[in-house]
């Protein structure tokens, strides 16, 4: 997950010794984003793939236990997540005297049988189907990891099936330090309203509903450009997002990396969290979601939302300023460092910076 790398880099720039590891890097990831890569796909003869991967992974894990004070992982596991040793991973970490911080990122924390009957949950089940046995295994793993973790950091929507949450932050990761804020929209311009929508999962993102809404607005004479960004690198995606006035994240659920990239670029961001859905209430009560300037929309309302923005360019520049202020306060590198600094302090570690190691 790129989020793990951006969080790790933020901690390192703040003076922590932090390293990130991945066992799968997608083609759209930035080269060199992760400090260590243990690829699952290495091809070896004579059926040696599995034992070779297990040996490399176990070796890295053992070295880490001698170096780190804090061990970050997901609900799918950490370094040993794709090995038969995953069930004992956090127990070994605790035996080594290392504190564990677990964060959800997505399907790792979803138990399909226990999800609410909502459009986003139905979309996830269609895109990432599971058998009942697979779902039961995920449920058991979540319960086991939550019980053994020293600290669980929440993440919007992904707390739906978690047995415990110690920190109700909306998102725990920053988008990276290399994103620059763009200019404010000119309210007097006759240029088209430019919309960008990075989409890696059309069904989950509501992409087809967005396209249909923009087509209907075109029929009404609206001068709107829609850029559907798919199948490109993160660098190219961000370049195209930077040209837009409005970033559409997703129309069915929460908000995530695309949204905070848009906030960092000083864009108007539209996403699909339902302010009345009970799942979001803890993030209003215990976190900062009530301050969020992101415009909410669903597949049913996106046309009206875009038409309102099209007809009032003045409001766009106001929201742009609010977006960047919100980003700096809650989703910047500094916000990430403050978040995990507080977590480490609650775990009793107050002298990590500059002399100890935190491995993400």
Q: In which residue ranges do the predicted regions lie?
A:
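Membrane-proximal helix-turn-helix segments that form the acceptor-binding/catalytic region
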Residues: 62-65, 88-95, 99, 119-151
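Catalytic binding pocket for nucleotide-activated donors in carbohydrate/polymer assembly enzymes
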Residues: 246, 251-252, 257-313, 317
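Short N-terminal targeting/anchoring amphipathic segment
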Residues: 62-86, 99-102, 246
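N-terminal subdomain of nucleotide-sugar transferases
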Residues: 1-36, 143, 149
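A charged, aromatic-enriched C-terminal amphipathic alpha-helix characteristic of glycosyltransferases
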Residues: 311-345
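A short, active-site helix/loop in glycosyltransferases that binds the activated sugar's phosphate group
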Residues: 111-112, 129-170, 212
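Active-site proximal beta-strand in glycosyltransferases
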Residues: 70-72, 90-127, 170-171
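Conserved donor-binding/catalytic core segment of Leloir-type glycosyltransferases
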Residues: 170-205, 211
């Amino acid at each position: 997950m790129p989020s793990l790398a951006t969080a790790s880099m933020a901690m390192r720039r703040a003076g922590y010794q932090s390293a990130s590891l991945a066992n799968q890097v997608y083609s759209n990831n930035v080269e060199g984003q992760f400090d260590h890569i243990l690829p699952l796909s290495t091809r070896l003869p004579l059926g040696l793939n599995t034992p070779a991967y297990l040996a490399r992974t176990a070796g890295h894990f053992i070295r880490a236990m001698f170096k780190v004070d804090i061990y970050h992982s997901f609900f799918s596991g950490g370094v040993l997540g794709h090995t038969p040793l995953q069930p004992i991973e956090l127990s070994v970490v605790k035996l080594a005297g290392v504190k564990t911080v677990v964060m959800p990122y997505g399907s790792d924390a979803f138990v399909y049988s226990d999800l609410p009957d909502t459009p986003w949950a139905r979309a996830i089940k269609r895109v990432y189907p599971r058998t009942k046995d697979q779902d039961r295994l995920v449920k058991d793993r979540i319960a086991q990891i939550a019980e053994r973790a020293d600290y669980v950091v929440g993440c919007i929507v992904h707390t739906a099936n978690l047995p415990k949450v110690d920190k109700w932050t909306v998102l725990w990761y920053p988008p990276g330090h290399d994103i620059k804020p763009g200019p404010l929209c000119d309210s007097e311009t006759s240029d088209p309203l430019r919309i960008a929508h990075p989409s890696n999962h059309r069904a989950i993102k509501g992409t087809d509903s967005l396209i249909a809404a923009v087509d209907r607005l075109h029929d009404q004479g609206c001068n709107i450009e829609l850029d559907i960004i798919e199948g490109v690198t993160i660098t190219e995606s961000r370049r195209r997002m930077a040209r837009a006035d409005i970033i559409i994240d997703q129309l069915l659920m929460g908000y995530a990396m695309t949204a905070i990239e848009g906030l960092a670029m000083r864009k108007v961001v539209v996403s699909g969290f339902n302010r009345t859905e009970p799942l979001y209430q803890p993030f209003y009560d215990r976190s900062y979601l009530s301050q969020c300037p992101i415009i909410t929309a669903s597949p049913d309302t996106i046309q009206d939302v875009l038409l309102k923005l099209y007809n009032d360019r003045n409001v766009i520049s106001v929201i742009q300023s609010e977006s960047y202020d919100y980003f700096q306060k809650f989703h910047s590198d500094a916000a990430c460092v403050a978040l995990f600094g507080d977590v480490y302090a609650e775990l009793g570690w107050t002298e990590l910076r500059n002399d100890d190691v935190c491995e993400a």
